[in-house]
Curated annotation (Swiss-Prot):
The keyword Cytoplasm does not apply. Disulfide bonds join C9-C202, C50-C60, C65-C71, C117-C191, C122-C174, C130-C140, C144-C153, C154-C161. Not glycosylated. Its main location: secreted. This is Thaumatin-like protein 1. Pfam families: Thaumatin. InterPro entries: Osmotin/thaumatin-like_sf, Thaumatin, Thaumatin_CS. GO terms for molecular function: hydrolase activity, acting on glycosyl bonds. GO terms for cellular component: extracellular region. Monomer. Its EC number is 3.2.1.-. It is found in: Secreted.
């Protein structure tokens, strides 16, 4: 499957992808990634406030992946995530936007061909409204990152946690996105296997 990663932000975003690596995207630029069929627990995110040297080493304010331009693993919270597992049983792809690792950039995650399946959006500037206890440089932390308790992180397994006032802060602003780890019923979507996708940083914001 191909993923077109598009930066519509007025600022530079350093895209990260696992699998895929990373790339600097100035406003209006696109990075096309080819992801192998059957890839699971894959994700794409944006990094902000980065400085890299000629060897691709440095640091980002949000989404940093061990100081590397070419990510080899996941990024550090807070970062808005497009997550996907491809070619799963019944010829389905599973796709979602997750705020379980917090929020740094508004995002739209959609099939490249409109209408094939759900256009998943988190197009609100959550950082600007972030509760004081969740504020982080350049973003807004999920309460799981801050408090690391089962109440917020669901570490004790299925059915041991539910929505909280702090998870609802995210859900109210981005109803399509995971606000806590067991938010599956309203946040996990399927597309036909073989679908190609588009991930947009800073889509036109919802009012």
């Amino acid at each position: 499957a191909t993923f077109d990663v598009v930066n519509q932000c007025t600022f530079t975003v350093w895209a990260g992808a696992s699998p895929g690596g990373g790339k600097q995207l100035d406003q209006g630029q696109t990075w096309t990634i080819t992801v192998a069929p059957g890839s699971t627990k894959a994700r794409i995110w944006g990094r902000t406030g980065c400085n890299f040297d000629a060897n691709g080493q440095g640091k980002c304010q949000t989404g940093d992946c061990n100081g590397l331009l070419q990510c080899q693993g996941y990024g550090s919270p807070p970062n808005t995530l497009a997550e996907f597992s491809l070619n799963q049983p019944n010829n389905l792809d599973y796709v979602d936007i997750s705020l379980v690792d917090g929020f740094n950039i508004p995002m739209d995650f959609s099939p490249a061909a409109a209408g094939v399946c759900k256009d998943i959006r988190c197009a609100t500037d959550i950082t600007a409204q972030c509760p004081a206890e969740l504020q982080a440089p350049g973003g807004c932390n999920n309460p799981c990152t801050v408090y690391k308790t089962n109440e917020y992180c669901c570490t004790n397994g299925q059915g041991t946690c539910g929505p909280t006032a702090l998870s609802k802060f995210f859900k109210d602003r981005c109803p399509d996105a995971y606000s806590y780890p067991q938010d599956d019923p309203t946040s996990l979507f399927t597309c036909p296997a073989g679908t190609n996708y588009k991930v947009v940083f800073c889509p036109n914001l919802d009012a």
